[in-house]
């Protein structure tokens, strides 16, 4: 796609890039094949890339920017990036520039200071577009590229608004395939490596499960979710499916994760993982987002529902939680406040617990229990001998 005239670099008489370079006596830019006259950048879409080899975030971001640049070149975009070095010396400058496929201004501390002041650079890496409607440094072009890759081009406020609207459409639009697939992938994967078409999942309640193996709360919650998943697989005949959205640090951790899970996953190498984290604004893990049978977002806080109510919270709607609370209150109202059971020496009080193990039948329990806090002793209400119950 051709870039419109509004995005072409402009060279007013003073105060712009061209004037600053001329004031320093610089008549050329650098490339790996030699010097490039300044006239070469006329008519091109220009971005200044402020970076340094000593900066870890710069070293992490530069490969991502190279990938974006090469993609845009292959698309025929007239983008030119110019490297402005924050390196400490000439040797470091050339070492850093060596990996870059674009141009650079000559290493010059006086020039660096002028460009830094002109464009308000307070941190690196920074990418500064030089055209109308550009996103400012404060508005974070780097973050936009990390979120959207080459789709962020041409780095304008209008494009940023368009991308946000696309995210909103995917989150609210009620189309599971549009949310989870793209033109190169229409499936999710199982732990045995098999592929499951996303179209086959339409009509089910889908849990998008965000997390990573290195995270202890994630591993703890996974065991709860596995129990819920297996219970619902039996009682609701496959109407619930979970899809892992991995935030693991590498594919090895992802594979370890998958061996402990009975459900599906977005492939680790697929960018959709990052897209979904952004679309649902996932900042903390684990997180569980529910997409209903109508393909619309039901809740972004299903983790709390599962932790509190287990499989009884299915299908994870607010109305179901209201119903559950009313049901549990009714159950509690029908039970005595205290009991004296011959299996334990102390009086037992009615209590609400997320989960416990009954000290008589040794089976797990949820919600109502008769407990002795002094002895950490719990009984299912059904394991209490009713004839000894003392109504209070």
Swiss-Prot record:
One of its GO terms (molecular function) is thioredoxin-disulfide reductase (NADPH) activity. Probable thiol-disulfide oxidoreductase that may participate in various redox reactions. It comes from Arabidopsis thaliana (Mouse-ear cress). It catalyses: [protein]-dithiol + NAD(+) = [protein]-disulfide + NADH + H(+); [protein]-dithiol + NADP(+) = [protein]-disulfide + NADPH + H(+). Belongs to the nucleoredoxin family. Keywords: NAD, Oxidoreductase, Repeat. Its EC number is 1.8.1.8. InterPro entries: C1-like_sf (IPR046349), DC1 (IPR004146), Nucleoredoxin-like (IPR052259), Thioredoxin-like_fold (IPR012336), Thioredoxin-like_sf (IPR036249), Thioredoxin_domain (IPR013766), TryX_NRX_thioredoxin_dom (IPR045870). Pfam families: C1_2, Thioredoxin_8. Residues 17-171, 177-326 form the Thioredoxin domain. This is Probable nucleoredoxin 3. It is an enzyme of class 1 (oxidoreductase).
